[in-house]
UniProtKB/Swiss-Prot annotation:
<dbReference type="GO" id="GO:0044219">
    <property type="term" value="C:host cell plasmodesma"/>
</dbReference>
<protein>
    <recommendedName>
        <fullName>Movement protein</fullName>
    </recommendedName>
</protein>
<keyword id="KW-0813">Transport</keyword>
<dbReference type="GO" id="GO:0046740">
    <property type="term" value="P:transport of virus in host, cell to cell"/>
</dbReference>
<keyword id="KW-1031">Host cell junction</keyword>
<feature type="compositionally biased region" description="Low complexity">
    <location>
        <begin position="254"/>
        <end position="268"/>
    </location>
</feature>
<comment type="similarity">
    <text>Belongs to the cucumovirus movement protein family.</text>
</comment>
<dbReference type="InterPro" id="IPR000603">
    <property type="entry name" value="MPV"/>
</dbReference>
<dbReference type="Pfam" id="PF00803">
    <property type="entry name" value="3A"/>
</dbReference>
<comment type="function">
    <text>Transports viral genome to neighboring plant cells directly through plasmosdesmata, without any budding. The movement protein allows efficient cell to cell propagation, by bypassing the host cell wall barrier. Acts by forming a tubular structure at the host plasmodesmata, enlarging it enough to allow free passage of virion capsids.</text>
</comment>
<keyword id="KW-0916">Viral movement protein</keyword>
<feature type="region of interest" description="Disordered">
    <location>
        <begin position="246"/>
        <end position="279"/>
    </location>
</feature>
Length: 279
């Protein structure tokens, strides 16, 4: 008998219990931890000489098995119209270098299907980045939804593949790749418009930008001048040389007379500047 379901969401097609089960599979603390440790979702992956090729599935193996079992059980009893599909609207990778710009090397990043033994780029979506091009943002858009199935001993799903080339003499980390995506799961699938892989070069962060503003420069110079003035003319509690007075008298500098009995005259006597030998 043919399936006679209607076009409804997964939550509406299944009961509340099974919907809750799916939520637990996707968003349990264990599933979230697996997404970080196995897939590097939102984490920085370091490209080193001892890991020149990195293949990161977009769904952890354990989570994949549980989701596939959930859809299969619903399909077997006629509650769902398929055994489940994985949909990823977009994968965004932020790539930064961790060596100087004169290092000769490059990265090749693409999206692959683990159901393909050759791990070829999906629809030719592949980006090559030379070291001096970094930093950069790279985006991929799959053109189909991936069936939740097992091919041989491989759990079929999309994966981000990163290859490191060159960097002779650099055995440590030469680049950091942080990937983000949002996987969706449904009992229905679709095909999508083919969009070429996107590559956007990003200007490096200018951490001295604030110091180039006139106001910032003025504040910096003023603070430096104040420091110089303080270091030369501020005295400690040390006693003043008695010869300072005689030298000040020899300078013979006249100041405008102040009115007798005025407050300014008393202040000038109280705050009379002191001259120190050698200054």
């Amino acid at each position: 008998m043919a399936f006679q379901g209607t076009s409804r969401t997964l939550t509406q097609q299944s009961s509340a219990a099974t919907s809750d089960d799916l939520q637990k599979i996707l968003f349990s603390p264990e599933a979230i931890k697996k997404m970080a440790t196995e897939c590097d979702l939102g984490r920085h992956h370091w490209m080193r000489a001892d890991s020149a090729i990195s293949v990161r599935p977009l769904v952890p193996e354990v989570t994949h098995g549980r989701i596939a079992s959930f859809f299969k059980s619903g399909y077997d009893v006629g509650e769902l119209c398929s055994k489940g599909y994985m949909s990823v609207p977009q994968v965004l990778c932020a790539v930064t270098r961790t060596v100087s710009t004169d290092a000769e090397g490059s990265l090749r990043i693409y999206l692959a299907d683990l159901g393909d033994k050759e791990l070829s780029p999906i629809d030719g979506q592949c980006v090559s980045l030379h070291n001096h091009d970094l930093p950069a943002l790279v985006s991929f858009q799959p053109t189909y939804d991936c069936p939740m199935e097992t091919v041989g001993n491989r759990k079929r799903c999309f994966a981000v593949v990163i290859e490191r080339h060159g960097y002779i003499g650099y055995t440590g980390t030469t680049a950091s790749v942080c990937s983000n995506w949002q996987a969706r799961f449904s009992s229905k699938n679709n095909n999508y418009t083919h969009i070429a892989a996107g590559k956007t070069l990003v200007l490096p962060f200018n951490r001295l930008a604030e110091q180039t503003k006139p106001s910032a420069v003025a504040r910096l110079l003023k603070s430096q001048l104040n420091n110089i003035e303080s270091s030369q003319y501020l005295l400690t509690n040390a006693k003043i040389n008695q010869n300072a007075r005689s030298e000040s008298e020899e300078l013979n500098v006249e100041s405008p007379p102040a009115a007798i009995g005025s407050s300014s005259a008393s202040r000038s006597e109280a705050f009379r500047p002191q001259v120190v030998n050698g200054l």
